[in-house]
């Protein structure tokens, strides 16, 4: 028996109430759900009421002018995400056409990867799978792992370690975190004493970059509390802007400073005995390997990353300043 596209569309229609519920639950807004689903707000309300009647429970509390999930609603939302992922995988398995992917790729990506590496991956991947819809979430490493554990994403790319037993990680690319400074400060090489006398700009707690930098500094005999001053910032772009403004020095991914190095706005500072490296990681739930869109993206990322690393090394050697 073959399953036609029409059959699959009918299956989607039968689950429409659950899709409406999932959209309201993700945004905690009937108005936003109506906009995203191209429905009127009363139509969304009608679908939710019908689902509540079918299940015999209240799914949302709308008192006080705010929409919140009830205990039963939170349970259903968790399973609604799982059901959506399974439906997407079924469609990809049964739709005709070799290599054709459809449905939704729910992808969680930590901040630095999302800004500087992901566009190079997605451009090629989505061109190969034009029927695929992308649902992209970004945040720091801890946030992405939590999205994975709550089934809001089916696969993730993170910058720091994930210690939860429910997830597994695979290294797909090496990254080097470099210390940057404003060129006119003439910091080409820093002694340990001069580094400690500088203001250090770091990412917030929960960031993979923050974890890796702290661990590398400690291995080299440094403690954050030993620095003259430490300023926490919530993004790589904020660190770069602060360094350009002369507020201090900071560690950022080598992927994040191509343009600034070429333009002479920033320079890389060497610190004796200090090299900060990490692996970018593909993260997924423990159990069967990801399949469908998530599995295809995992395989693509693991393969494509090799080419990106080679491109970066070639660019770095071409742009390396003569000393």
What is the predicted role of each segment?
Residues 168-205:
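Flexible hinge/capping segments at coil-to-helix
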Residues 17, 54-55, 76-98, 160, ...:
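Alpha-helical linker/hinge and terminal dimerization helices associated
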Residues 117, 269-311, 315-318:
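A late-sequence structural motif
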Residues 140-145, 149-153, 158-159, 222-269:
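Hydrophobic hinge/microswitch elements
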Residues 22-40:
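Short helix-boundary/capping micro-motifs
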Residues 52-71:
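A short LG(V/I)-centered, amphipathic sequence patch enriched
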């Amino acid at each position: 028996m073959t399953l036609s596209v029409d059959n699959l569309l009918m299956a989607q229609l039968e689950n429409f109430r659950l899709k409406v519920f999932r959209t309201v639950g993700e945004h905690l807004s009937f108005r936003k759900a109506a906009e995203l689903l191209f429905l009127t707000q009363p139509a969304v309300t009608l679908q939710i009421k019908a689902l509540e009647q079918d299940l015999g429970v209240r799914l949302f509390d709308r008192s006080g002018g705010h929409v919140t999930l009830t205990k039963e609603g939170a349970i259903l939302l968790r399973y609604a995400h799982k059901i959506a992922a399974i439906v997407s995988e079924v469609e990809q398995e049964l739709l005709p056409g070799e290599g054709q992917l459809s449905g939704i790729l729910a992808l969680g990506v930590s901040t630095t990867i999302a800004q500087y590496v992901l566009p190079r991956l997605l451009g090629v991947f989505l061109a190969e799978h034009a029927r695929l819809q992308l649902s992209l979430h970004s945040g720091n490493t801890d946030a992405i792992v939590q999205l994975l554990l709550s089934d809001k994403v089916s696969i993730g790319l993170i910058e720091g370690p994930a210690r939860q037993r429910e997830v597994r990680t695979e290294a797909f690319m090496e990254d080097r975190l470099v210390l940057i400074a404003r060129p006119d400060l003439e910091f080409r090489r820093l002694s340990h004493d001069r580094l400690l006398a500088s203001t250090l700009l770091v990412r917030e707690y929960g960031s993979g970059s923050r974890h890796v930098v702290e661990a590398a500094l400690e291995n080299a005999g440094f403690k954050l509390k030993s620095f003259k001053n430490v300023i926490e910032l919530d993004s790589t772009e904020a660190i770069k802007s602060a360094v350009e403004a002369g507020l201090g020095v900071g560690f950022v991914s080598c992927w994040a400073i191509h343009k600034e190095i070429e333009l002479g706005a920033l320079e890389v500072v060497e610190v004796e005995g200090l090299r900060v490296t990490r692996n970018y990681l593909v993260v997924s739930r423990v159990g069967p390997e990801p399949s469908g869109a998530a599995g295809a993206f995992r395989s693509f990322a693991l393969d494509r990353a090799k080419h990106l690393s080679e491109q970066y090394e070639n660019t770095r050697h071409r742009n390396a300043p003569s000393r």
